[in-house]
Amino acid sequence: TAETDLIHALRHHPGCTQAQLADTNADKFHAKNCRFVSRLNLYPVCGAGRSLYEHCHFEQTDDALNGNAVYLDCEFDFYSGMPIYQASGTGAVFLNCTFHCKYPQDGETHAQYFTKVGGQIALIDSSFAGLPDTKVAVLWTKYPSVALKCYQANVTYPEGRFTPPEVADSHTVDIDEKMLAEAYYIRKDGETIYNVYNLLGGKDDWDPLGNGEVIRFAGKTDIPTQLLLESEAFELQAGGSSINIKGKCLTFDGRERKCEIHFKIEGDSADSIEIQRVSEGSCLLQLKDSNIDHETEVVLTAQTKEGLQTGAYVRIHPRKVAAPRLTGNPVICLEGKMLRLSYDFTEAENDCSDIIWYRSRNIRVEDKIVTAISQPDQPEKVYAL
């Protein structure tokens, strides 16, 4: 499917509707020199297995753009903060694009997210613009997952007025000096060749820009652009079995490629976990100390030498033991405007009691309402009235 210099005649109507132009289940879609304009969402022909928008203009609000596509030499007018609902699959790639953030000059800092619910974004050789006194904070998504990594190289922002995503935020990876950059572009003799062939070539060597021969000669094909783990959260039990962690590298069109993945643990309890390499794409995690007596959480990071990254939480649970015995019934005493719960164990124990306070209108505990809870390993023995 392709649309080039195509104009759909305007039919004015007073109704306010979403501009959902078309759906397609085609394998390939290429739009060139097209304008997609809607101030109430947008839907610029989505659904193809591989989509390229070349030298196109977009005007939109939220949930508007194709979240699994390549945009080359395109221009965007953002009238709201979340132009993509979700960057699905291997995400969205913007090559040499310009983003105009159409926010008022009101002195407020406006949040410009790329997605509403997450997904991978790559920004290459792109720039942001806005009105002279507009302030904008550029972010990937409002609630990023631990696994989310977005990639950027040579992105420019209006100095002093725009705040870019920080590399230190753990979700932003600058690939300008990394081998991964060649998945998106090749710099040669002062010229930039955008590697759309690597991104969209697939098994049938689709070459919409006609530079596939140059890319193949340079050996820059089948370069993965995404690293995934099997889950975003793993569980380790003290005294339990080790867990096997597997990762995979995907090309932009979703084909799995072999790659060497390196794993490491970060967090306050990182020293309590041992990593054993199993293969080039997997590892075993095992607790060094089986006597851990509290719950904790660390972050497992995975990366390749080319520059791909991802992450996951590893939750560590203490060994399950029998509940300690009490010397007698617990007692609640009134101390001024405080209630204090007192109890003792028959043997010295690390007190991990989970105490929950309720409020009820009668002694039969009808319509009880939770008013206070314990934090992990911190029994809530005192309640303020």
Language-model features: where?
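Short, solvent-exposed loop/linker segments at the N-terminal edge
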Residues: 233-241, 331-337
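Solvent-exposed loop segments of extracellular immunoglobulin-like
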Residues: 257-261, 348-356
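Low-complexity "stalk/linker" and mucin-like segments enriched in Ser/Thr/Pro/Ala/Gly
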Residues: 264-282, 360-369, 373
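A short beta-strand segment in extracellular, disulfide-stabilized domains
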Residues: 242-248, 336-345
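A short beta-strand micro-motif common to beta-rich folds, especially ectodomain repeats
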Residues: 293-306, 380-385
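Solvent-exposed segments in extracellular or luminal domains encompassing
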Residues: 284-291, 369-385
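Sequence-level preference for short, compositionally simple segments enriched
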Residues: 1-223
